[in-house]
Regions:
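Hydrophobic/aromatic residues in alpha-helical transmembrane segments
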Residues: 33, 37, 74, 78, ...
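Short intracellular "coupling" helices and adjacent cytoplasmic loop segments at the cytosolic face
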Residues: 47, 83, 91-115, 119-121, ...
Length: 583
């Protein structure tokens, strides 16, 4: 896990190294301060020598200023290193998600990924900053101060030897108890983010059904779960501070009591016991030792929280894409020929029944193929295998007479344009959205594909035309308009294969027919696969595939299927009857 996260430090290695180095220098000079104070008291104040007082006073001031300067520089390096580390980590997760196949993405919810890239990374950033600064400063301070204290008076310093292990056992018990609770907290954060995301995305539906109270109740329930888990964790962590304070005050009292007795016992003779300066120095070292222990306990608490976050981050970073480029990939797709050769597919390999079962299919380049089937008949699953969004479980799929697994994935997908069931537009102008298909497309190219998709007729009515700003998710355009813009975007790719996954369901039949006519006239060499609920959308196709429960029940033209396929005929007649009733 540490090795995985450390890879995100990269260009901030210098700051990551310099922060502990300057912290070590800060501690070195800070450790010298009590020794100089002892000299100032014993040789200057007790002897009434102003020259010695000035001498050690100036040295003390210089050492303190150097220590302060090193501390400030260390803080600057730590801030740069931790912020840069978090930035790189956020980028690494984001880039990793872009590489995921659909199968990988299915493992993580959107809300979970958002939590990992925000809350979890913030926790790791804070822990990283504490590790390269405080987690370095505190142990060095502890060891050096203990060494100096033992050098002054070994017997008194045995107090620390008893206190520190007791403190360590207590901290370990707290860590083991709290870590599982924080794991539950961050999983609940995923659920909370999912509820917020779902509510905001569907806010119009929520309001139209007056379900605000129900949504508030869902939110409150999850929020209360987070509250209860956090309170439980904090109640356990609360023992950390009393434990530290008990150790601090016990050590201070024992040092004061035993140290004072030692000074009195020697009767002022420094050769026989502890001098006043040494006692003050020992007391200062006591404070340094105990403060370093307190800071270490804070680091441990932060690490407890960050550990749960780090595990969640590494879960994403260590996820390997289920789709890999072959060692010697094919970069050119010759044509739009498609062949399904005994294809079996399942999203879950342990599933009892495959989603697609022994599918055999031949499509020639330039053909228009219709796909008809009921809900859950695996129409979308069928076409998602063509651009290799998923890999087949058995069999093979050929595009341009080459197995899709032998292609360079990017090259294959550049030749397959797919308009998914769920049409997505991004915030930006219409032009910016359409140029997802071709970033170098001219205004003339954009207008041409919009004419093919029958989108130009409504775009021209907008005051800003193609520069009209699309809100996030395309909320300021209708469903039919969104579908036509998505079709235009796909056409800009100039693909060899065009797949429309129920992508004209929100447009009227007249516009649907106009789009299909434009396809036949303008892109005759492109293989067109049209998934539709309306038979009218596919009845002119060269072939119509009838799917049912993941199996091809019939293939043929409209007239042939009306004679040979009961399923197709029933769908056609029910839609025809519905149309007649509406008239």
């Amino acid at each position: 896990m540490i090795k995985t996260l450390a890879g995100s430090i990269r260009q901030y290695k210098k700051q990551t190294i310099m922060s502990p180095v300057t912290v070590a220098l800060e501690v070195f000079f800070e450790i010298m301060i009590p020794l100089i104070m002892a000299k100032l008291i014993d040789e200057g104040i007790d002897q009434g020598d102003m020259g010695v007082i000035w001498k050690y006073g100036l040295i003390l001031l210089a050492v303190a200023m150097i220590s302060l300067f090193c501390g400030a520089i260390s803080g600057k390096f730590a801030a740069q290193a931790s912020s840069g580390f978090a930035k790189n980590l956020r980028q690494d997760i984001y880039y990793k998600v872009q590489e995921f196949s659909f199968a990988n993405i299915d493992k993580f919810s959107t809300a979970s990924l958002v939590t990992r890239m925000t809350t979890d990374i913030t926790n790791i950033q804070m822990a990283f900053q504490m590790i390269i600064r405080i987690a370095v400063r505190s142990p060095i301070m502890l060891v050096c101060a203990l060494f100096a204290a033992f050098k002054i008076d070994a017997h008194l310093s045995l107090i620390y030897v008893i206190t520190v292990p007791i403190l360590g056992i207590g901290l370990y018990a707290i860590i083991m108890k709290v870590h599982p609770i924080f794991e539950r907290v961050f999983k609940t954060y995923d659920h909370l983010n999912a509820i917020v995301q779902e509510n905001l995305y569907g806010i119009r539906v929520v309001k139209s059904f007056t379900r605000e109270d129900h949504e508030v109740g869902k939110f409150d329930q999850v929020s209360d779960n987070i509250y209860r888990n956090f309170v439980k964790a904090e109640q356990i962590l609360a023992f950390n501070m009393p434990l530290m304070q008990l150790a601090v005050y016990t050590c201070m009292l024992l040092i004061c009591w035993l140290g004072a007795r030692a000074i009195v016992a020697c009767g002022g003779d420094e050769a026989l016991g502890l001098s006043t300066g040494e006692f003050m120095s020992l007391f200062t070292y006591t404070m340094q030792i105990l403060m370093s222990l307190m800071m270490l306990s804070m680091v441990f608490v932060m690490i407890i929280m960050a550990r749960a976050s780090a595990e969640r981050i590494c879960e994403v970073l260590s996820e390997e894409s289920t789709l890999k480029n072959p060692e010697h990939p094919v970069y050119e797709v010759k044509n739009g020929d498609i062949q399904f050769d005994n294809v079996v597919f399942s999203y879950n390999k342990k599933a009892d029944k495959p989603v697609l079962n022994h599918v055999n299919l031949n499509i020639r380049s330039g053909q228009t193929i219709g796909v008809i089937g009921g809900t859950g008949s695996s129409k979308s699953s069928l076409v998602q295998l063509i651009p290799r969004l998923y890999d087949v479980t058995e069999g093979r799929i050929l595009v341009g007479d080459v197995d899709v697994r032998d292609y360079d994935i990017e090259s294959l997908r550049n030749e397959v344009a797919m308009v998914l069931q769920k049409n997505v537009l991004f915030s930006g102008t219409i032009k910016e959205n359409l140029r997802w298909g071709d970033k170098n497309a001219t205004d003339e190219d954009i207008q041409r594909v919009c004419r093919l998709a029958c989108a130009d007729e409504f775009v021209q009515t907008f005051p800003d035309g193609y520069d009209t700003y699309i809100e996030q998710g395309g909320t300021n355009v209708s469903g039919g308009q969104k579908q036509r813009l998505c079709i235009a975007r796909a056409l800009l790719k100039k693909p060899k294969i065009l797949i429309l996954d129920d992508s004209t369901s929100a447009v009227d039949t007249k516009t649907d027919a106009a789009i299909r006519k434009a396809f036949a006239e303008e892109i005759p060499d492109t293989t067109k696969i049209i998934i539709a609920q309306r038979v009218a959308s596919v009845e002119d196709a060269d072939q119509i595939i009838v799917l049912d429960e993941g199996e091809i029940k019939a293939i043929g033209r409209h007239e042939e299927l009306m004679q040979s396929s009961d399923i197709y005929r029933e769908v056609y007649e029910s839609q025809k009857k519905g149309g007649d009733d509406n008239e």
